[in-house]
Amino acid sequence: MRPGTNTAVRRVNSASARKCAVVCVAAIGIAWWAAVSPARGAEITGKDPAGAPGEAAPDFALTNLAGTTVRLSDFKGKIVLLDFWATWCAPCREEIPDFIQLQKQYSGRGFTVLGIALDEDGAAVVKPLAQKLGVNYPLVIGDTQVAARYGGIQAVPTAFLIGRDGRILKAFVGARSKSEWEQTIRRALPPAAPGQN
């Protein structure tokens, strides 16, 4: 063996080991991100919700926390953020303060949040949380039929932005930041009159 050959081999092996280490660290990082990322949106299957943009949003008749029947068609002419959620879902609860603010900001421009709670215990668990957080938008108690009509809701939160004509503009799986929701809502609303947000 020529002098210096072992040194060259060691250098090659060392460089290969470094490349391997970088690849391994990157793979571990990607795997970790994939494992923790769904928790933000509480995704169960990663399946997109039903309801392609342009399709009519399925109507429903559900009971609100006061026992009154509420229909999606009651809101025709408004931009509706239809939010499927549950009290046991941490990302859902985290979004509620943002929805309260969005309702305050944009309800005067023909926008509303409409929450559909998918809790098995219904109003008994939803009402105390709504009161505690000061929810200012309509909440109704969902059921398996309405979930099925919207594609079998595979994860919460799942939301649908519905246009003034009652057609789906966009579907979302997982939680979003207030700024993301605000951008989406502003794009859907008509231009603001002077002095409006």
Regions found by a protein language model. Name each.
Residues 1-17:
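N-terminal secretory signal peptides that target proteins for export/translocation
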Residues 23-32:
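Bacterial N-terminal signal peptides
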Residues 31-59, 191-197:
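N-proximal helix/coil linker or "cap" segments that precede and/or mark the start of modular domains
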Residues 49-54, 59-80, 103-106, 150:
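A short beta-strand-turn-helix
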Residues 78-80, 84-88, 155:
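Short pre-active-site segment immediately N-terminal to redox-active cysteine/selenocysteine motifs
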Residues 93-133, 142-149:
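Structural microenvironment flanking redox-active thiols in thiol-disulfide oxidoreductases
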Residues 128-136, 141-186:
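Thiol/disulfide oxidoreductase modules built on the thioredoxin-like
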